[in-house]
Amino acid sequence: MVGVPGSGKTFLAKSLSEKFNCEILNRDLIRTSIFPKKYINHSKLQNNIAFEVLFKVLKQLISNNRPEYIIVDGKPFSKNYEIEEFKNELDKLSAKLIIIHVTASIDIISSRLKNDLKNQYPLYRDPKKDSKIYNTQLMINEFDKINFPHIIIDTSSHIKEVTKYCFNKINEFIK
């Protein structure tokens, strides 16, 4: 899953996991699981450590269990080099990468982020320590245009419609 915070990556991941009966590895969940709550600062270092753990789990699952699909969530993959590094590692494991670029309108993303801020939902981010993401346009501008084959999914519609559309696009993509 690739996309800015608030685009609907986690919501779509959960819905797809039910449709595909697949696993979700979420960097944000890992971060909140391995760092004591009072020390979580959402720094680049903490994000990198959490992603390293996620990738070790991913490698183990691919090497030993070979599930048909694993959704990687909680890491925006905002830069092409991040996607390329991840793809190269998956290639070593003979695993295929399907990039799903999750989008929504700026108004919807802003609304979702404000809702997160209001609810202080700690799984995804700490609004007081990472206020940059609450400037939606600035955040979107910091993302590279994806230079790899990918599926674009707009999560502005009802989740059942979005999931069905995404499911069909994935099936087209893998043919």
Roles of regions detected by a PLM:
Residues 51, 55, 159-170:
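Short, amphipathic alpha-helical "lid/cap" segments that border enzyme active or binding sites
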